Amino acid sequence: MSDYLVIVESPAKAKTIERYLGKKYKVKASMGHVRDLPKSQMGVDIEQNFEPKYITIRGKGPVLKELKTAAKKAKKVYLAADPDREGEAIAWHLAHSLDLDLNSDCRVVFNEITKDAIKESFKHPRMINMDLVDAQQARRILDRLVGYKISPILWKKVKKGLSAGRVQSVALRLIIDREKEINDFKPEEYWTIDGTFLKGQETFEASFFGKNGKKLPLNSEADVKEILSQLKGNQYTVEKVTKKERKRNPALPFTTSTLQQEAARKLNFRAKKTMMIAQQLYEGIDLGREGTVGLITYMRTDSTRISNTAVDEAAAFIDQTYGKEFLGGKRKPAKKNENAQDAHEAIRPTSVLRKPSELKAVLGRDQMRLYKLIWERFVASQMAPAVLDTMSVDLTNNGLTFRANGSKVKFSGFMKVYVEGKDDQMEEKDRMLPDLQEGDTVLSKDIEPEQHFTQPPPRYTEARLVKTLEERGIGRPSTYAPTLDTIQRRGYVALDNKRFVPTELGQIVLDLIMEFFPEIINVEFTAKMERDLDHVEEGNTEWVKIIDNFYTDFEKRVKKAESEMKEVEIEPEYAGEDCELCSSPMVYKMGRYGKFLACSNFPDCRNTKPIVKQIGVKCPSCGEGNIVERKSKKKRVFYGCDRYPDCEFVSWDKPIERKCPKCGKMLVEKKLKKGIQVQCVECDYKEEPQK
C-alpha cells in the first residue's frame, strides 16, 4: 500500500510524477475540475453575499469515489494541481470533496515536471492559498452573472445559442471597431522617387528625402514633376556620410501571450493549438531510456522571470557551444518575493541541454516545431546583443537630397540562434552600400517616381488580437485562447486570410450590448475588473466587495434590457440559386470559417455546400470546366477544375488566361517575397515580379 496520495489534473501528468516520487507515492488524476456551478441554474445566491452553490460535475462521481477511497487509505494527501488560480481552485474543491483539513500543508506546486523540481516541491508543501481561490471564484461568479443574465435575453431577442461575456464581448468590440476604422478610412495620395546610383561599378538604391536639408513630402504628381524638373544632369555629390554602431537586444523569453503570437507568426498555429501542444510538452514526453520528462515549464504565465538555475545552465551551454563573446551581459537575479504570481517563470525548456535536434525521434512534427521555438527563444534571450554597423548617405543635386541607408551585421550575437517572426524578412539580407566618402561624385542610373496611397489599419490576426488584449489589460494567460475560440464558435466573427472579420450577427449582438450593457464592452472597465481580481489574489481586496460593486448597476440594466430590448430578425441573404435536393432557395450562412451555402428549408433539408469562387479561367487540362478557388483542410488556397472528380486538375499557384509566349502552356501567378511573378509551368519563361 502507498503511504501518500498525490492528486493532479491529468493522467499524463500523473504517470510522469509517480515515476519520480517512488513506491511510497500513488499519483491519481482528477481529470480537471470535480465541482462547478450547475448548468441548469445560475448557482449563485445573490441575497447571501453571492454565495456559490457548487455541485459535482456530471460524470465525475466515479472519479471522486475512487479518489475518496484512495485518500482514506493514505497517510497524507497532496494536491498538486497547476500553479495558478485555476489550479488552486481545483485543489480547494478537491480538499472539500475529500474532507481534507484546509489548514494542513496539503498543497504542492511546481513550474516544471522534472525529477529535481518535483522532489524539491514536496519538501515545501503549504496550505491552500485562499486569496488565489477567491480570485478564481470571483472571476467564475462574475462570468456566471454576466452570461446567465444576458445570454437568455439574446436568445429571446435575437436567436438561440448566443452568449455574452466580459472578455469575449470586449474582443468582439475591438474587431468591430477595427472594421469601422477600415470602412471609414479615406486613402491619401503620396509619391516616392527612388533612384539607382553608380559608384564605379557598384550600384545602390537611394530615395528622395527633401530640399535644402529639410524633408519634403510629395503629395501629388505635380509635386513630383516639380522636383524632377529641378534635377540637373546625372551627377550627385555625397554631401553627408553618417556611420553608427547599433545594438539590438534579444527578446525576453516567452509568456503565454508572446508564445501564442510567435507561434501564429512563425508556425501558423491557432492559439488553441499552441496551448494544446504546449500542455503536452509540459506534462511529459517519453524520451525512452530517460523515461517521461516534462520538456517545458508551465505554459500559462505572464512572467518573464527565469530561475537562477536555468540562467546558469544556459550560460554554460552558450559558452561551450558558441563562445564567451556570445554570453549575455549582467543578468537580473530572480525576484525575491515568492508569492504565487512571482513564483511563476517564463516559458522555457526545462533543460537547454535537450536540444531540439536530439528529440526528433520522440516528438511529433508540431511538438518539435513548438519546442524548437521555445528552446531557441530562451537560449537567445540569454545571449549577447547583436551589433549592426549602420550607414546613412545623403546625395545632393541642385539642393535636392536623396538618402541611402545601409546596414551590416557586425556581430550576430543572439541572432545566431533566433530572430523574432516579424523581423525575419527585414534581417534576411544585409543592405550594403559602397565605400562612400563625403565629396565623392556618384551617377544616377535610373530615377523612378511611384504613386502610392495610404492604407487602412489591417484587420486583427489572432497574434495581434492577443497582443492587444494583453496590452489593454483584458483577460489573463488562461483566457486568451478560449476567448478567440468562443467568438468564432458563436458565429460573431469569421477568419478571412487568417484575419478576423465581424459577421452581421456579431454586429447585431455588439450593438445590443453597447446599448443596454455599455460597461461590459468598455475596455477600461474590463481592464479595471482584471486589476481588481489581481488585488483579490494579492489579499488586498475582498472578492464579495468587487462583485457587489459590479452587480448593483448591472441588475438595473438587466431589467431594462428585458423590458425594452426589441426583437431582431436577421433577414436571410439569398444566393440566387435553388437547392438541388428540395428546390428551396439557397441562402448564405456564416460559419466558423467564413460564409457557406445552406438550404433555407433547414431543418427539414440540411443541404450545405461551400461557396465556389470562379477566377475566369478555363481548365487547361480538360478545356471544358472552369478553374475555381478552393481551400484545403488546413485552409490553404488552391485552384482546381469545377468538373472534379471528372477532371482532377489542381494547382497551388493561380492560373491566368494568357498562355506562355514561348511554349504555349499554362501561365500561373506565383507568390514570392518580392511580389507576384507570372511563370510558365513547363518552360523557363518568367516575368518581372509585380508588387
UniProtKB/Swiss-Prot annotation:
Keyword Metal-binding among record annotations: yes
Cross-referenced CDD domains: TOP1Ac (cd00186), TOPRIM_TopoIA_TopoI (cd03363)
Catalysis performed (reactions): ATP-independent breakage of single-stranded DNA, followed by passage and rejoining
Cofactor(s) required for function per UniProt: Mg(2+)
Positions of the Topo IA-type catalytic domain: 129-558
Active site: Y298 (o-(5'-phospho-dna)-tyrosine intermediate)
UniProt-recorded Gene Ontology molecular function terms: DNA binding; DNA topoisomerase type I (single strand cut, ATP-independent) activity; zinc ion binding
Protein name: DNA topoisomerase 1
